[in-house]
A protein has these predicted regions:
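FIC/Doc superfamily catalytic core
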Residues: 1-143
């Protein structure tokens, strides 16, 4: 039996548009959990809906859906694909900054000079769902 690298399996499922497989579930769970930790209001079902159709509906008629939540979730889908395509590239500053740029493209943060999208942070991060958790200060980020 021939061994298949996980990345090759995921890329194969992606390229063949396999529904319900490892690639499909990884995309949805990765995007939902990462964005939820950052304060996204999209549900797992809405995340799947966005992945499947490119659109999302509110769970309730009075719920609002933030544009940044949609953009960041879509960006996560794109970033996951980008990582699959660059998995063998050396991890360096350029790769990290490119990935950050993909994640924040089209969001309100992209146009905020304090956010330095596509570069290293210049202001401290806040993880809205984890009170009391402190992240590394910008001055302490190794370059």
């Amino acid at each position: 039996m021939e061994r298949v690298r996980l990345v090759d399996w995921l890329k194969s499922e992606r390229d063949q548009h396999v529904g319900g497989g490892l690639y499909y579930n990884s995309q949805i769970l990765f995007a939902y959990n990462s964005n939820h930790m950052e304060g996204s209001t999209l549900s797992p079902e809405q995340t799947a809906q966005l992945f499947n159709t490119g659109a999302v509906l509110p769970d309730n008629i009075n719920d609002e859906i933030r544009a940044d939540d949609v953009a960041e979730t879509t960006n996560h889908f794109n970033a996951f694909n980008w990582v699959l395509d660059h998995i063998d590239d050396p991890v360096n500053k350029s790769l990290v900054c490119s990935l950050h740029g993909i994640l924040k493209r089209g969001t309100s943060q992209e146009f905020d000079a304090n956010r330095n999208v596509g570069g290293y942070k210049i202001v401290p991060n806040v993880i809205s769902q984890l009170e009391g958790i402190h992240t590394v200060l910008p001055a302490d980020v190794p370059l």
